[in-house]
């Protein structure tokens, strides 16, 4: 947002989009509620949806598609008192131990991943000493035990010897547990005349964001180029063909990804 403002964009914060209308080449309208409660309707040739999983544009269009071949869910919560992954409590004092060898950087300051049959777990250190701990699992391979999301998360964490050790004296932050029953989704279209969806608003694969951010970046750059071409006067029929090709190829890319 800072970069956008430096490039001449007018940034409203806080603000909330309360309605919008897509009218193709005739233009689009977006109604925004500002911090003081006033509502302003602006018109634009292009609307870019970057609302994350809220996916305002796609939900209004009805273009969201589930990924039936990748039935994953996730639970996550912040913990206090997680052990130091490089500390003696976990690593021990024997430098010949396979878990201690060849460790150059501090694992405590990095995102660490632990895997098991049908699932993977993340440990992400946060400011203030808390650690985000999350679970992603494939419902075809694993059904975590428990009645509540926290109980299900705890059952898997307790079943993994290393995460069980890491959380021996840790406590979850009360009221912080979150659950998503269906993680991945795609859109039937990512761009068309006058609108596009980017980032998680354009689809979501997995919380493993290392490849996920690559996919987002590819999509943003390609759609930016198409918007610039359209604004520079490229023929509508030519752009329509380009949009169709992009939608088909990007969906194939995400499916393969």
Place the predicted regions along the sequence by residue.
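FAD/FMN-dependent oxidoreductases across multiple families
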Residues: 111, 117-121, 125-129, 141-257
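Predominantly flavin-linked oxidoreductase catalytic cores and closely associated redox partners
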Residues: 3-165, 220
